[in-house]
Curated annotation (Swiss-Prot):
Coiled coil: none annotated. This is Protein RecA. The gene is recA. HAMAP family: RecA. It is found in: Cytoplasm. One of its GO terms (biological process) is DNA recombination.
Length: 362
């Protein structure tokens, strides 16, 4: 390459850097300092602050140790699958760390007694039971903009009824009104949520699309906007019952990470939700321990470091409940092997892994 060509390339690079500096200074003058920066210049930008879901397995499956703050989360599934329970457990975990939490109860169905059993501090939980969808989303926007709330739950998107629908007649057809309401609200909320580092969890219900020949006919309410804006989407399903003799004492639950902007998606985890107790932590220790090879299973017997935990899963759970020090030791070992466990979750997942189950549940 000739000297003239080299000089031309150098001049161009100098011109580009000068033009970039001028553009950056103009943006900062117009919109304030910090309105634009190099991503690596602020180390805090890279770090992701999380809140535990109350389930060790789900925290591992999410890839970052919990649900991310400053993001929109969607939890959806059929009725009585554990959506509100999972949201309340996340609130309880945030409160344990001193977080301020709010619950927008659009369904008017929150049970304070059950919330207390899950570990929620009712004295410090902000609750609103709005009359209309507009009111619910305006309250959500105000709380997020305050910058003082750490976790905010909206239960549920399906119950966010537009004012026009409430004031209208019982048979009026107002197509797309709820979807437009959600789309506008999320456009307003998304920047505030990021700046305030507040996690907003939307609980959603599922509906059936009519005339679908191929693929799953299931869809969520409130249009497509929430699917795009959510950083994490969790599909929660009841897959069986937990019994003590003949009495049903809980649900076997499967959660699939359908969307995850923070880590690889499509991982799924199974755990027990016990009535009046929430996620069974001891049950998770047994199941995850076996999956990671930390807890040995020989026939019906479970053992850890040559110490027998019990014959049968329920007896092993009871033993760990009565020996919290041993349970903590197993939990620590599981957290150290989180990467191995997450890989095994992914082997059972995949975008189409649940099609058969979804069809079976319809």
């Amino acid at each position: 390459m000739s000297q003239n060509s080299l000089r031309l390339v150098e001049d161009k690079s100098v011109d580009k850097s000068k033009a970039l500096e001028a553009a950056l200074s103009q943006i900062e003058r117009s919109f304030g300092k910090g309105s634009i920066m190099k991503l690596g210049s602020n180390e805090n930008v890279v770090e992701i602050e999380t809140v535990s879901t109350g389930s060790l397995g789900l925290d591992i499956a999410l890839g970052i140790g919990g649900l991310p703050k400053g993001r929109i989360i969607e939890i959806y599934g059929p009725e009585s699958s554990g959506k509100t329970t999972l949201a309340l457990q996340t609130i309880a975990e945030s409160q344990k760390k001193g977080g301020i939490c709010a619950f927008v109860d659009a369904e008017h169905a929150l049970d304070p007694v059950y919330a207390r059993k899950l570990g929620v501090d009712l004295q410090n939980l902000l609750i609103s039971q709005p009359d209309t969808g507009e009111q619910a989303l305006e309250i959500t926007d105000t709380l997020v903009r305050s910058g003082a709330v750490d976790v905010l739950v909206v239960d549920s998107v399906a119950a966010l009824t537009p004012r026009a629908e409430i004031e209208g007649e019982m048979g009026d057809s107002l197509p797309g009104m709820q979807a437009r309401l959600m789309s506008q609200a999320l456009r307003k909320l998304t920047a505030s949520i990021s700046k305030s580092n507040c996690m907003v969890i939307f609980i959603n219900q599922i509906r059936m699309k009519i005339g679908v020949m191929f693929g799953s006919p299931e869809t969520t309410t409130g249009g497509n906007a929430l699917k795009f804006y959510a950083s994490v989407r969790l599909d929660i399903r009841r897959i069986g019952s937990v019994k003590e003799r003949e009495e049903v004492v809980g649900n076997q639950t499967r959660v699939k990470v359908v969307k995850n902007k923070m880590a690889p998606p499509f991982k799924q985890v199974e755990f027990d939700i016990m009535y009046g107790e929430g996620v069974s932590k001891t049950g998770e220790l047994v199941d995850l321990g076996v999956k990671a090879g930390i807890v040995e299973k020989s026939g019906a017997w479970f053992s850890y470091n040559s110490q027998r935990l019990g014959q049968g899963r329920e007896n092993a759970k009871t033993f760990l409940r009565d020996n919290p020090d041993l349970a903590r030791e197993i939990e620590l070992a599981l957290r150290q092997n989180a990467g191995l466990i997450a890989d095994r979750f992914l082997q059972n997942g995949g975008p189409d892994a649940d099609d058969g189950d979804a069809a079976a549940e319809m």
